Amino acid sequence: MGTIYLFRKTQRSLLGKLTQEFRLVTADRRSWKILLFGAINVVCTGFLLTWCSSTNSMALTAYTYLTIFDLFSLITSLISYWVMMKKPSPTYSFGFERLEVLAVFASTVLAQLGALFILKESAERFLEQPEIHTGRLLVGTFVALFFNLFTMLSIRNKPFAYVSEAASTSWLQEHVADLSRSLCGVIPGLSSIFLPRMNPFVLIDIAGALALCITYMLIEINNYFAVDTASAIAIAVMTFGTMYPMSVYSGKVLLQTTPPHVIGQLDKLLREVSTLDGVLEVRNEHFWTLGFGTMAGSVHVRIRRDANEQMVLAHVTNRLSTLVSTPTVQIFKDDWARPVLASGTMPPNMLNIPEHHVIQMPSLKSTVDELNPMTSTPSKPSGPPPEFAFNTPGKNMNPVILSNNQTRPFGVGYGTTPYTTTFNQGLGVPGVGNTQGLRTGLTNVANRYGTYTPGQFTQFRQ
């Protein structure tokens, strides 16, 4: 025979895998728009950072960080398209929807870290306020505002759209909602615009641009440079307050928690499942949020022994699928068994007491050397060995024969009871002795309890 050579598949590097997945995404024309906006965002961010350096404005730098956040949101939208194209694999049986959650969580946390950096730099500037040049401050403000709004309203970002609606409202949204109610009380026609929950990203873009416009006017009129630092702190606080609820919501999804508003509906579904035909018990239920708008869960269902497993499984899955997109149901039948009762008459000899009781002394030999018949391996003792179980005189003692002193009829004597074999392999076998005035119909007397045969009753001669 010739030599057999094993050919292994060449493992691609990380860069090669990323290139392959990027080609998969770019095959869809819907992703071209995202890539175009991403390229424009990089160019726009470069210009804004240059203007931040020339104007020496911390407020414009804080506002530019929102443009960088837009780039993260575009990457998240691109990941969302990739997740839609990928199918579940044996390693990731639930799919790749959690990557969307991870992208949203990372983007919001990075935005909060940028806000903290702005707060730290602004605190240092309060001690020594530099001069602010307003040459390109207003131009940079409107360029950033236009691009941020155009990106948010043109690109359909499914993950961030869901998070902005599902997460709790930020303090900025609550204050704007209060002002909108007051304004709509004066002008009712604006209720259709201001009363609904405003998009938090659009709101922070408008609020940041408004703060920069106030900064520009105060510096141009009074050369009040400290207002730039105050505006930077205001934009950083608004950024942190807007991103914090989204990061909390996406973090809870990553921790596989159950949303509070779904717990009542899940309890109702489980009660309905427990009332299905053949279902005895529903236990070990666990439900969690798999992605944005999708839930997964597992449940164990105990059914009757005569129930149809496939039928019960279909009914349970149908009930749970109304709320849980990926349910996992494990069916197992009831293992309770009734004790087997003996039918028929009981033999009369079962109640007879033998002449002697043979009591086997318990063996004090360690059970470590004994084999378990189920596993064919030495079984471990269930408890610690006795304290004085080693080298004791009664370790290999033979059985003890205890006489049974039963009451006999008057006038019947006790004959001697010779033994054919005194001790035979640890069992005493008594013989039949001669009795005075006693005639029996047995040729062999049984030596174990419960082995007597009918006709062994003694007869007495008058």
UniProtKB/Swiss-Prot annotation:
Its main location: Golgi. Pfam families: Cation_efflux. Keywords: Golgi apparatus, Ion transport, Membrane, Transmembrane, Transmembrane helix, Transport, Zinc, Zinc transport. InterPro entries: Cation_efflux, Cation_efflux_TMD_sf, CDF_SLC30A. It is found in: Golgi apparatus, trans-Golgi network membrane. Residues 55-64, 120-134, 222-223 are extracellular. GO terms for biological process: zinc ion import into Golgi lumen; zinc ion transport. The chain crosses the membrane at residues 34-54, 65-85, 99-119, 135-155, 201-221, 224-244. Residues 1-33, 86-98, 156-200, 245-462 are cytoplasmic. One of its GO terms (molecular function) is monoatomic cation transmembrane transporter activity. The keyword Ribonucleoprotein does not apply. It is a multi-pass membrane protein. GO terms for cellular component: Golgi apparatus; trans-Golgi network membrane. The keyword Phosphoprotein does not apply. Belongs to the cation diffusion facilitator (CDF) transporter (TC 2.A.4) family. SLC30A subfamily. NCBIfam families: CDF. PANTHER family: ZINC TRANSPORTER 6 (PTHR46531:SF1). Heterodimer with SLC30A5; form a functional zinc ion transmembrane transporter. Has probably no intrinsic transporter activity but together with SLC30A5 forms a functional zinc ion:proton antiporter heterodimer, mediating zinc entry into the lumen of organelles along the secretory pathway. As part of that zinc ion:proton antiporter, contributes to zinc ion homeostasis within the early secretory pathway and regulates the activation and folding of enzymes like alkaline phosphatases and enzymes involved in phosphatidylinositol glycan anchor biosynthesis. This is Zinc transporter 6-B. It comes from Xenopus laevis (African clawed frog). The gene is slc30a6-b.
